[in-house]
Amino acid sequence: MAFTEQEIHKLNQQFKGIPPEEIISWAIQYAENPLVTTNFRPYEVAILHAVTDVAPKIPVVWCDTGYNTPNTYKHAEELIARLHLNVKLYVPKQTSSHRDAVMGIPGIDDPRHQLFTEQVKLEPFRRAMEEHKPDVWFTNLRQGQTALRDSLDILSLSRDGVLKVSPFYHFNDSQLDAYLKDRNLPNEHKYFDPTKVLENRECGLHT
């Protein structure tokens, strides 16, 4: 399933305003090895519900940094059980307790922050992608989250040529709230990403 940038641009124009479920069904139809990634942050339930409603057995890759809030872990367990998620868990090679003893969580201005991000997020993510080798990657990127994400669209290509599909790209928080309410889906806002710290920073997965 290979598309040129020109084809992707044309498809993005066609998909604007199309329900997420239809975009997902289109992508699943052409995908040979799709997956969806999640960190169970706020509104992740939308992409997980929508994708697994179309493809119930799709691999759900969760790269757990080890630094999630108790609320996030409880939320994750609730969604895994409720949506019957086929979770593939990836964790850092070093435990958070070990890292806390020798490094802690460096601030974003600390030179060690890049190494910290590599250890807890980027390396586990690369390992997951190398093992699954997806051709379609469902994610919940949305316009307005960061400057980089504002430059993307519903469909985009990763640096490795994987087709990223963000069916809720044009949804704002109010629209997602309505989506969740209509489907009686839970949300959780007590979330912290130590690799980003600030809401408008990128962690490196989508750069």
Regions found by a protein language model. Give the residues of each.
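Nucleotide-activated chemistry modules centered on ATP-dependent adenylation/adenylyltransferase
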Residues: 1-207
